[in-house]
């Protein structure tokens, strides 16, 4: 309650609705004005700026104005000099939204990566679908990885790159999590083997998503001069080839015997 009271006092110190309405409009105009489009078609402009607005609804600030936030370990932590973010539906957003943020919100991208690292320190792995500080484990892949790597390769922020890479590697090596151990052993995830974290059996999709994320880890490691790690993950990234069925020209699931 004390944190909420501080937030209210800091963000809305006066009882003046019209003032804050005007400030909110100005803030949104400033945000949406980061990209200017040209053309005479008003419908196209409405569609574009509506979509841009939607892209800015999440991730969301999760820390109080004094930096306090509730971590995945159920403890209160402090973000000193940065803002903690949550609401990361990374399977949905790593392809387009997060690359967009590197152009429209680079300072926030830095804080998002720091939020990932903090989550790893408190939970032992990077977030998959983080919502208000907790992990939902919805969707697949470890797609905090491409977000981190994109920021690193673009030279964004002052986050700890070594710690970020460590977090990526640790997450990619959780053998008991959603078929990762089988992915490493067989070069793909078999559809007929399930466990606590692999019960939904998205074996083909997981294999493809993991291979992409592994390629990203390899690229970051290479840039950091860690060629042994880069070689390991470049090799893993080729696992996508193991689910290509030349007989049908489709990517297809395989069982633990290798049969499509």
Pin down the residues of each PLM region.
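Acidic/polar, glycine-enriched structural segments that form the non-catalytic walls/loops
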Residues: 1-84, 118, 125-128, 158, ...
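Active-site-adjacent structural elements in folded domains
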Residues: 35-39, 65-86, 129-135, 179-206, ...
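A conserved hydrophobic secondary-structure block that centers on an alpha-helix together
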Residues: 38-41, 83-87, 94-99, 103-129, ...
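Structural helix-adjacent loops and short alpha-helical linkers that scaffold large soluble proteins
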Residues: 39-44, 61-67, 103-113, 152-166, ...
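Alpha-helical support elements that line or immediately flank enzyme active sites
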Residues: 50-63, 86-109, 149-154, 215-224
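Long, well-ordered core segments of solenoidal/helical folds
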Residues: 59, 105-127, 163-181, 189-195, ...
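Catalytic cores of carbohydrate-active enzymes
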Residues: 127, 218, 224-260
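Active-site lining segments of carbohydrate-active enzymes
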Residues: 136-209, 218
